[in-house]
Regions:
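Glycine-enriched, solvent-exposed interface loops adjoining structured elements
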Residues: 1-216
């Protein structure tokens, strides 16, 4: 069963030899530890393309429209693949300057989209330009790794590498409090980094793409 936000905070408090709480918002200190848990969560989620963070954002194009919002993607995602499933095409990523020239210089061709480039933000979500401008309805699939939102409710759960997040939050707690004769903050951080490496290695064995080495 996944670890809740409250359980993670209490785990860190216990390691710091502090009193556990019934809600993260109970004391100023438990709220601070909650901040550290969220900081550690972001660090861990950004460290690897975790399977639990995979999402597919779907777009159905409109004829003559080249710009779309990836609702639910946020801004800190990582792209795995983008497909035009209607035309059975893997879409290629263009740099922003090239896409701007394609969309603004000369007569715009309208056909099945084959290229994309990210362009701006709307409502906290990334926007994307596609080219050629669609001449009808095409189903586009953006396969992304999307970090989870910050934990705020006691019942929210951690998604990836829970022991690592707790260990790194504990290390942050040690830095804030100062040394007290127990594990030093540098030792706690080193242990957290080693744990993170182990979790990444274990996750990587489940996916063949993480075991390929390509000469460059």
């Amino acid at each position: 069963m996944s670890t809740t936000y409250l359980q993670a905070v209490n785990d860190v408090l216990t390691r710091l030899r502090e009193q556990t709480v019934t809600t993260v918002a109970l004391t100023d200190y438990s709220q601070l530890i909650g901040k550290f848990v969220n900081d550690a969560k972001r660090q861990v989620e950004n460290a690897f393309n975790w399977n639990a963070l995979r999402q597919t954002i779907s777009i159905n194009t409109v004829a003559g429209t080249s710009n779309y919002t990836l609702t639910g993607a946020g801004q800190n995602f990582r792209v795995e693949d983008v497909f035009n499933t209607t035309s059975c095409v893997t879409m290629a990523n263009l740099d922003g300057n090239t896409m701007y020239r394609y969309l603004n210089f000369g007569t715009l061709p309208q056909s099945s989209p084959t290229h994309y480039a990210f362009s701006g933000v709307s409502g906290g979500n990334a926007k994307v330009d596609i080219w050629p401008v669609p001449d009808g309805v095409y189903a586009l699939k953006f396969n992304l790794f999307v970090p989870t939102a910050d934990l705020s409710s006691d019942s929210y759960t951690l998604t990836v590498a829970e022991p690592v997040i707790i260990q790194l939050a504990y290390a942050r707690g040690l830095v804030e409090r100062g040394e007290d004769g127990g594990l030093s903050s540098s030792e706690a951080y080193a242990l957290g980094r080693a744990m993170l490496s182990d979790f990444i290695a274990m996750e990587g064995t489940n996916f063949i793409e993480n075991q390929l080495f390509v000469a460059v």
